Amino acid sequence: MSYFLSYCKAHGGALLTGYQALRAEGFLCDVTLETEGSEFPAHRSLLACSSDYFRALFKSHTQESRARVIHLHVPSAAGLQRLLDFIYTAWLSLSMDTVEDTLEAASYLQVTEALGLCGRYLERQLAPENCCFAANVAARFGLAHTLDAAERCIVSHLQELLARGAGPAGLLELNPTSLRAVLGAPDVARVPEARLLGLALAWLRQEPTTERLAHCTELLERVRFGLVPADVLRRVYSGSGLVLPARVKGLIIQALNYHTTPSRQPLMQGEQTSIRSPQTRILLVGGRRAREVVIEEVAAPQRAARGQVAAPEPEEEEEELEEEEEEEEWELTQNVVAFDVYNHRWRSLTQLPTPLLGHSVCTAGNFLFVLGGESPSGSASSPLADDSRVVTAQVHRYDPRFHAWTEVPAMREARAHFWCGAVGERLLAVGGLGAGGEVLASVEMYDLRRDRWTAAGALPRALHGHAGAVGDRGVVYISGGKAGRGEGGASSLRDLYVLGPEEQVWSKKAPMGTARFGHHMAVLRGAVFAFLGRYEPFSEIERYDPGADQWTRLRPLPYDRFCYGLAVVEETALLLGGLKWRDSRQVPTRNVVGYDLDLDRWEDIGCALPWAWSGLRCAVLQLAEGGDDEREGEVGEALDLVLG
């Protein structure tokens, strides 16, 4: 004898269809639901199967459980009608006008499937014009997933909502939980922090004020006061019209102390001073560039059909660049350009205080420091006279939080073609060419905490055109360069010098396999890499193992280059722009190549600099998303909001 089990997919639907027919006929209806004067005949069995409320009610031994008419405290008869239609048909009719009433009924009667459908409907309908409403509804009815989606929608469209006005956009009616989430979101983009502070203060001033002020601390502590201008902070502290809790006052005082000690700011970084929605960008700073029109934002050249057409061979590319060089005119530049290495886009970020060549850059606490270099002896408006440059000792610092330059105390000696780096709480400036063209062995150190330069242990010999890097535990490496004056004054060197964090005397280590000048170094996974410089016919790359004191030759770059910029992003060394030799001539190269550490392989990443550029210096910073034009009016608008 054989047995089998069959399943009918249509049975469930047929059962509901039968119940709906009975309901339409009023046949076998054994209970009537009443609200707002409207009555709805129904079947106890189906109600108990669909609603936790009715299941518990009908199981209880109370007079109401046996009553023919049950009075419900559902605020909307229309909402109850839609919910009963769902129970009998599995279809729920929803719109933004009816979803709240439907949720009222579903929540009261504990119809969990209807609650889930309403939540998913709100998520699918999310848009800037309704995201605040959706967040309030989701918070009211405990729809956690929908609430999270609505809050993310508010965060992503906050700039647009604030542009429409906090009141009309619904931000001032937002529930406190959602507002707290928005103010604390790390990925708020294109909204100055002062506007977030103004939004919080405007919300707290709304009626009922007493009830809202109970949320003052939990809201305002989410504002990053270190990103708010000092003038705004002072007005908030003394003239906001609100009684600020001690916790908030403490945060404001802490931020004011941050603003009044600029030299220590790189050492005072934390959540209160961290940029929201940070974007990793490579900054290309100064040097010489072709005299072309600056393009605000340049998309990288893309291969046709997403790579279906092969890129030109290196020889063809060099020939094209050589032809361009015939008409190339160079000038010293003040440009600082931000490069999005992930999306291959360029954006003009800011301008150096003066055009520079032979300068050095480093970062500390997400600040960019630009040190020394050669600048025009005349006005900055005539930057192309290569024979009238002076070596400077000036140091400038760029703050991406406020898009502002600050002058730092100048170095003890003017320097060009030197190396600088951040070591702990100090900046180190090593060697270079002095104001009179002399080659320097001196080393000086800038103490960020004390805001002054002091002499440090000098190099064993004077050097310029050398490279440097900071390794693990703050060990400084200096390699190559020349000891003589001018490019032809001496041969390139192979020497490697090392300075430990607590040492005053440089140690000489194993020399490089190739003499180098005007090259670059970088530390990747604890190893020190030396990349090619000028007059290197074989384009060889080397890796130094500090533990073994040994150099290893790696795969050479497919084609030579010099006067390029170097940056390291996610353990990938990127070489940007520069010059190369072609038929005994210097020609520009605008491409960007990356070194794959695991495969010991070079790869052209498929984008070009916005113009021919040499002598540039590169650094990696976290920048706020958006352009500088969005910062205009920040202080004035924020003060208006602070004063109500």
Swiss-Prot record:
Extent of Acidic residues compositional bias: 313-329
Region (Disordered): 304-329
Annotated ranges, domain BTB: 29-96
GO cellular component: extracellular space
Kelch repeat placement: 320-366, 367-425, 426-473, 475-526, 528-571, 573-623
SUPFAM superfamilies: Kelch motif (SSF117281), POZ domain (SSF54695)
Domain BACK: 131-238
Domain of life: Eukaryota
CDD domains registered for this protein in UniProt: BACK_KLHL34, BTB_POZ_KLHL34
PANTHER family: KELCH-LIKE PROTEIN 34, LD33804P
UniProt-recorded name of the protein: Kelch-like protein 34
Natural source organism: Homo sapiens (Human)
